[in-house]
Amino acid sequence: MEKGTEHKSNVTLQSFTSSSTHQERLTPMMEQYIEIKAVNNDCLLFYRMGDFYELFFNDAIIASQALGITLTTRGKHLGKDIPMCGVPVHSADDYLQKLIACGYRVAVCEQMEDPAEAKKRGSKSIVQREVVRLVTPGTITEEKLLDPTRANYLMTLARIKTSDREEFALSWIDISTGIFRVTESHHEKLLTDIMRVDPQEVIVADSLLHDKSLKSLFNVLGHIISPQSATLFDTITAEHDICNYFKLSTLEGVADYSRPELSAIAAAIRYIEKTQITHRPPLMRPERQNEKATLFIDAATRLNLELIRTTSGQRDGSLLKTIDRTVTGGGSRLLADRLISPLTSPEAIDKRLDSIAFFLRNTSLSEAAHLILKGGPDMSRAVSRLALGRGEPRDIATIRRGFEIISELNQLLNNKLLPQEISDVKEVFSRLPTALHIRLNQALTDDLPLLKRDGGFIRPNYHQELDKMRNLRDESRRIIAELQVRYAKETDIKTLKIKHNNVLGYFIEVTTLQASALTNNPQAKAHFIHRQTIANAMRFTTTELAELESRIAHAANHVITLELEIFDMLVNEIIAQADFIRKVSEALAVLDVSVALAYLAEEQGYCRPIIDNSLTFHITAGRHPVVEQALRKQAIEPFVANDCNLSAKNNHQYAAIWLLTGPNMGGKSTFLRQNALIAIMAQMGSFVPATSAHIGVVDRLFSRVGASDDLARGRSTFMMEMVETATILNHASSHSLVILDEIGRGTSTFDGLSIAWAAVEYLHEVNHCRAILATHFHEMTALTKKLDRLHNVTMKVKNWEGNVIFLHEVTEGAADRSYGVQVAKLAGLPEEVITRATDVLHQLEQSEMAGKGHKLIDDLPLFNLQTISTTHKKTDKYDAIKEALKNIHPDELSPKDALEELYRLKKLEKESSL
């Protein structure tokens, strides 16, 4: 919830409850509301009133603004109107989605009985209501509220502090799929670990909010932080609570969790029990994440490289969006998971690459699998909704359709020599619970209603008693039709109709003119009982019709009751198979990702990388995957591929460092990023945009590309640059890959050059890492004489008729200039500015900077009116002549006309020079 909202809501209720006892009497309904709201004061309360959820007081003001709905009033308190707004129950999910997106938490309060049951306890009794669920950003499961391509993680942050140290752990759960993971962390790594998972809600002990050392972290995370009572993280009963949830007698032999990990896991479980009230989602046992098993990518690097979203927060333009060819929600989520956590084991990476290679070789099999998978149902999320009591017939249909797809894919993969990863998938498919699959096919109709309360989702001939009740219901309706014919004949009123509405039930309707035949005839009057008079018509009933209506209602209600009982039986059978459904969902996702990456490799011309434990980094004809596809879509010139070889040379123990110089707009930043992205794609187990690639596993990837302020923490661009550079120099190893773009540019020339110089030496002599460093400090190219593993490379350019052409090719050597003025000209700076800048640059290049600054200033006076005027005159002269030449068409001129045009041009030249 946004800061200040909770406090404001508390004040409203406190003032209300403290004064209500002696100021004025509350209505019973409002007393009930206040009582329930007081227990859920950190949430907006959706209070069920018939077909609406209503909100009151400050909740109503907040919701009306967030949802754009009308704010009205209901009743008064202390002489003031009570604010109120409401949303229809049938469309509540749409409104919940908006509130959750704004960071609010919502308590859903339902009616636990109907008004008729309440009245049995007394005429003044009110309907019993209870909060059945807390809806928070990290605990949603509704299909409408979830992005099918994105995991929805709830994270807990636990800290165990002793006198001499503090330990941290993070656990995260997606209750919509059952994923449950945990890892240890430390203070410096917390932000990186949290950003990698990208949770929608982070649970922390409220006591941590006052810890100054964590303040900057919480400021960055913003509204996704959800403070809870510190008792949620209690470790005394943590093991007991975990065992109780997973129905284990002990954790021994299951996992050896540390104390911080136990605290984080227990907090997650307790929070789920708190928000889900009576239901427990089927979760995997917490899987410990080994930080050494994945490529470490810090928060700044993830942002700079735009892996999941761009720096502006958009998915379009990110690497994930560019390479995603999956066709299922689970496949898309798995692809994102692999992208944020690339592997460091060559064996594990090769298993994934083998799967892609297999489908590239077997294109017909790949196409068939792709067609079967296309639009495949999200079984893991469906079973979670069913387990939480939020399932509908279409969720069961999702399981049925999923089983059909598994059966088809299992048959497709039969008798094939499969790679290990796909063989494991096939093994899971072969364990399909056939009996349940058959039962679902037998029980469910083909076209299912949206809501189970509507009925009609169980096939005829599946359940004998249900068929009997349906026949009775349908037969009664036929009898109604026959009764109408008989009554019309008996009364001689041909227009007599038997109708139905929710107020009167079944009734006989005749026009007012014909009603006298029933009201004036004593015999008819005794038989036809008057119910209602409306404009132009009168309504009646009979004892026979009332009894028939009772039988119809009983049969119809019994039909719904039986269908719901069958629904619950099927749900229980499905939940009993929850572990299998989760595993088979994972297998479907693996297959989808493998087929999709094979499709991507074929479509884009990617190659299989060689991955080992060496210090090699050799990319031939590498391309930037995002830029390349963008250029192709825009039908612009093709992307220029470039080699990159950071491998050790001349029997050196350690790998090389490239110092990249060249012009602005030459493609330096693109080249830097593309090599980082190629490394990530290779280690996530994907083919890569290159002709060939040999990469020794990268343990840590650091990228300092682009400039940005950290205003939230009061850091300038230069300070941010230095903080990120410090992280690199302090943590990079010989197996790391470092990408640095123009280090030191945020300060004065000499300061920046000095820092960049020292950083390169440190990377070379201490870190021994593979690195590409782009710079405009051309003085640094001299370092290659001192540092034998440092190599100069530059971006090629071509000068043509005074203009610079960027070739975007990387070649050996060093640039002697940056072509900044030429780039400024391309950007459209005024011509007088370009002319002036050229003059200044020329004189600067002719002078020695040190000791001659004052003379240089004297030689270069500031802009003055004469300079600008002269420049404008030159510009006007050239523009006039150009315009005249543009309007001349030589092929259409006679010799006389040509001579006249020549004289006119000469006259223009004279006038322009005055």
Curated annotation (Swiss-Prot):
ATP binds at residues 662-669. The lineage of its organism: Bacteria, Pseudomonadati, Pseudomonadota, Alphaproteobacteria, Hyphomicrobiales. CDD domains: ABC_MutS1 (cd03284). Residues 1-23 are annotated as: Disordered. One of its GO terms (molecular function) is mismatched DNA binding. This is DNA mismatch repair protein MutS. Gene3D superfamilies: 1.10.1420.10, 6.10.140.430, DNA repair protein MutS, domain I, MutS, connector domain, P-loop containing nucleotide triphosphate hydrolases. The keyword Glycosyltransferase does not apply. PANTHER family: DNA MISMATCH REPAIR PROTEIN MSH1, MITOCHONDRIAL, DNA MISMATCH REPAIR PROTEIN MUTS FAMILY MEMBER.
